[in-house]
């Protein structure tokens, strides 16, 4: 009987290990966004607690960002961002779900491979199809995902007050850096 229990436990633990090898995950990903313009105060924030998961067999990718996790140099900017622009109480998170086109783990090395990613970004209650380019590198058994792209706040019904518009860029530059284990 003990042997049967032991063999069953080994079988299920083995299956869990096999399944977990199909996914790479992080809960400490980094997203930085910037909407600065010359001659005005820097409009830049970072979030160091972004979650992301990649299915290494299918190329499916999903990411979750808690909006209150973005931190600015100036506390007042952070307050305005959460209360007036992104409305974090009403829209507490942004979610991306997509697919890495032609993803093949075997083709990725430490120098990295560029891939096209297509998916849906839900931000401020609005879902939009987006396409971005990502660089994916192997780092030991881990994957590093790097991307830079632009977003237009108007496309997500994020209203910038007229008094602030001249002090912010019309498009927001987004930098993504995830180390998935």
Please state what every model-predicted region is.
Residues 1-24:
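Bacterial Sec-dependent N-terminal signal peptides
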Residues 20-181:
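Low-complexity, acidic/polar, glycine-enriched regions of mature
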């Amino acid at each position: 009987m003990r042997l049967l229990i032991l063999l069953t436990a080994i079988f299920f633990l083995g299956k869990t290990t096999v399944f977990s090898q199909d996914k790479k995950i992080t809960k400490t990903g980094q997203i930085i966004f910037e909407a600065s313009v010359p001659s005005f105060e820097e409009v830049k924030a970072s979030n160091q607690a972004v979650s992301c998961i990649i299915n290494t067999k299918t190329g499916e990718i999903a990411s979750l960002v808690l909006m209150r996790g973005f931190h600015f140099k100036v506390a007042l900017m952070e307050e305005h961002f959460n209360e007036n622009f992104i409305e974090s109480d009403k829209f507490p998170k942004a979610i991306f779900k997509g697919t890495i086109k032609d993803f093949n783990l075997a083709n990725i090395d430490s120098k990295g491979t560029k891939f096209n990613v297509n998916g849906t970004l839900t931000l401020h209650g609005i879902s939009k199809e987006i396409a971005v380019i990502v660089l994916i590198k192997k780092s030991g058994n881990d994957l590093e995902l790097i991307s830079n792209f632009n977003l237009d706040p108007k496309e997500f019904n994020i209203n910038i007050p007229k008094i602030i518009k001249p002090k912010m860029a019309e498009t927001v530059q987004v930098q993504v850096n995830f180390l998935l284990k």
